[in-house]
Amino acid sequence: MSNLSPDFVLPENFCANPQEAWTIPAHFYTDQNAFEHEKENVFAKSWICVAHSSELANANDYVTREIIGESIVLVRGRDKVLRAFYNVCPHRGHQLLSGEGKAKNVITCPYHAWAFKLDGNLAHARNCENVANFDSDKAQLVPVRLEEYAGFVFINMDPNATSVEDQLPGLGAKVLEACPEVHDLKLAARFTTRTPANWKNIVDNYLECYHCGPAHPGFSDSVQVDRYWHTMHGNWTLQYGFAKPSEQSFKFEEGTDAAFHGFWLWPCTMLNVTPIKGMMTVIYEFPVDSETTLQNYDIYFTNEELTDEQKSLIEWYRDVFRPEDLRLVESVQKGLKSRGYRGQGRIMADSSGSGISEHGIAHFHNLLAQVFKD
């Protein structure tokens, strides 16, 4: 904590009692010093969910992801092993790949044409045979920890990190219970936004349904708020609620035991199992700075050829539901800097943990306090 002023120190028991809790102070959402601390103490040390395994199912498939200024490339080798590396050439630092797609059997740097095998080993460096003491072992790509877990791909920049299951104990089994088809999902749509909001602001918004009625009329028409619960499980939480058919959003057969499952994963991923069988949505957050977050909002179905009903649902997410949340977090980010905001807001957590209770935010802010404690 020596690099932070006392303004950024939180007591270890901050928000420990949700019914008496207030949010973290506003400057934690706006000050770059807080974000720099989070970069090293949250994002460089945590397992971050970055993709569904189906996006990297075949040999030579690759994707790139950027988080806290680091570009990471994930690639499936010809040996079918999925690996992650820092997306940087060890020669002079040029990035190797961009976007996603099919890699060739060697990755060639665009700058000086150094070539690397898909396992990260150097294949060839031009003129290296004429360079004294050239050591190919020191010219390999630098690996990033990677695990496939519950149908998804996670990375961790800490080489000494324990497993995803250690960070999120019990999550995998619960996701599989909520969506038995999770391993069969395929990406159907992606909405990418560079959102002018702090990553914690976006998580706060996700961790409560207090705003659902006023801000999400279509979604609220399908969720039964009186049969909606939010349970805490350490580094992940589960929002669970029974669903009802709605002409505004989710259409399914009346009388089925349909439900919503919303999983938040520390620090910044949200997995959503919808009432529609064989469907999930995922919000991947990739923080850029204290007031900017790159978000991928991905929609998955088990079938590749989409039905008209599925296409309509994608359009509803794109044109209605997603913009509703974006407007909320963008407005909050502006308001947090207002002279009229008192610096902290009362967390509306009720004693019953009802469907509109904000106790999930208190839980999240207590986890943040462990990062900012003295």
Task: Label the model's feature ranges.
Residues 6, 10-26:
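Short, contiguous pre-domain boundary segments
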Residues 45-56, 125-129, 264-269:
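Short Pro/Gly-enriched beta-strand edge/turn motifs at strand-loop
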Residues 55-159, 163-173:
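Rieske [2Fe-2S] iron-sulfur-binding domain
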Residues 43-47, 94, 211:
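Generic structural signal for secondary-structure transition and capping sites
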Residues 3, 76, 87, 147, ...:
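C-terminal catalytic domain of Rieske-type non-heme iron oxygenases
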Residues 24-67:
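Non-catalytic accessory segments flanking enzyme active sites
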